[in-house]
Amino acid sequence: MTVRRVMGIETEYGIVVPGDPSANPMVASGDVVTTYATSRGIRPARASWDYADEAPLRDARGFDMGRGIAHPSQLTDVEDPTLANVVLTNGARLYVDHAHPEYSSPEVTTPRDAVTWDRAGELVMREAVARLATMPPGINLYKNNTDGKGSSYGTHENYLMSR
């Protein structure tokens, strides 16, 4: 059976700065993104994303929480100038997702292509880590799903389906 739909894979990577347990993971994640982008001549400029339909303070029932009582981490509609975000030449997106670097594959139409471009994301991250290793203490990335301290992250498969 042939699969005929648009799909993609997003992978969030765990991040650690060796020997520095107090390192800011958002800054370290930004270093991963900008190091790779710069090494490839990709300008790490902010892409314009349309968040007009998003309501980060609305729950599943449709009720809105007031901004004044929301925790700052819930105000995700406010742009953070420290976050790095680039679109790669293969159509993938490499960016900081909260406190993790994330590789979002290009949209594809076959499972084989989804796996191919997910593997490309691993190579992107490997190259970024190798380049950062030349500037101690370097950075370690993990393709697992928890850091043992309560933070979790992972991989998301995405499929375009008719309703």
Where are these regions (language model features)?
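Terminal catalytic/cofactor-binding subdomain
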Residues: 1-142, 151
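Alpha-helix capping at helix-to-loop junctions
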Residues: 134, 162-163
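Histidine-centered divalent-metal-coordination microenvironment in nucleic-acid enzymes
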Residues: 145-162
